[in-house]
Amino acid sequence: MLDAALIKECADPSLKPAIVEQFVAAAGSTDPLAVSVESGGRLILVPKATSAGEAMAIVRQYVGQAVVRVGLTQFPVGVGVKNAADLQPDLVDACENLRKGTSMFAKVLRIVAKSYGNPESDDVIPQIFEDAVYAWKTGEFEGVSVFQAPDPGGSVATEEVLRSDDRDSHTQDSASEWPEGNDSVGSAAMRIDLSRIGGT
């Protein structure tokens, strides 16, 4: 769980703190020095960095050859960088990584919301969030490279994104409710003749 002061100081102000927490929980890491490297759809095991210098050495080793993500938000390192020498060590700074990552995620969220027609219904917001997290992880949404795409601007009404466990419990509650009516055997809406089962 992220520190509330870190979120308040560093996260993109267009995202509510609950959205930032859920974004980092779904797509990020609890370790600001975390580096993940993926090539050809496969995760490459890299040594765990114990300092910012080690993390940046790993990043510089793989950038340009593989998809490299770093920090709390698992920010995609190649975005906006032409040369490995241009990489700044602030990528592994918790505050700066959260600032850059949430700013980029807010843009991705707006891109996804625009494809939905910028709805304000509370029923659609969780799906938009899930699609935005998926787009963050893959780098694409509906064939568009979300990191290089222009920001559509505007805002997304993200009042509350339901957590998946909250949604699951809600659907289970509604599924367990039986329609009211007569409990007699003959009052069923649909009947199936099962008399032929068993060979009789």
UniProtKB/Swiss-Prot annotation:
Give the domain of life: Bacteria
Q: Which family does it belong to?
A: To A.tumefaciens Ti plasmid conjugal transfer region I ORFR2 and ORFR3.
Stated name of the protein: Uncharacterized protein y4dP
Q: Which UniProt keywords apply?
A: Plasmid
Q: What species does this protein belong to?
A: Sinorhizobium fredii (strain NBRC 101917 / NGR234)
A Pfam family cross-referenced in the UniProt record is TraH_2
The record's region (Disordered) falls at 149-200
Which segments show compositional bias classed as Basic and acidic residues? 160-171
